[in-house]
Regions:
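Histidine-centered nuclease catalytic patch
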Residues: 30-75, 83-88
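Polybasic, low-complexity binding patches
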Residues: 59-70, 81-125
Length: 125
């Protein structure tokens, strides 16, 4: 099983379509590489590093996200582009914040929270 299959199965099991953390519908068979322009193709998804490999937040100097399955999540291509390498912000009308769950040396595993109707929830739970 390759990485994209592992990530999809970890979050969605055997489903062939799902909704990402920002409420965008994605389809298992529409995985795309991050470098492909897919802005006009509905339902495409890619793998996001929850805690980015190279965070754009100055408060986390010397910390980088890991490639562990626990630091990866499926996001629609557009959601992933909007989230970028930020640890908090807004995608569409959903506010998000990344929390550090585990750190081994300088490699970090993160988990994302989303704010819906004024309340914070762990994404995908």
């Amino acid at each position: 099983m390759n990485r994209k299959e592992k990530v999809w199965k970890y979050y969605f099991g055997d489903c062939t379509k799902a909704v990402d953390a920002f409420g965008v519908e994605i389809f298992k068979d529409r995985y795309v590489d991050e470098n492909i322009n897919t802005s006009k193709i509905s339902g495409c998804w890619t793998i996001d590093h929850i805690f980015p490999l190279n965070p754009s937040d100055d408060n986390v100097i010397n910390r980088k996200g890991s490639n562990s399955i626990y630091n990866l999540q499926p996001l629609s291509f557009i959601s992933n582009q909007k989230k970028g390498s930020r640890l908090n912000g807004k995608v569409g009308n959903i506010t998000y914040a990344v929390k550090i769950i585990e750190q081994i040396n300088n490699s970090v595993v993160g988990k994302m929270m989303v704010k819906v109707d004024g309340a914070w929830y762990w994404a995908y739970e």
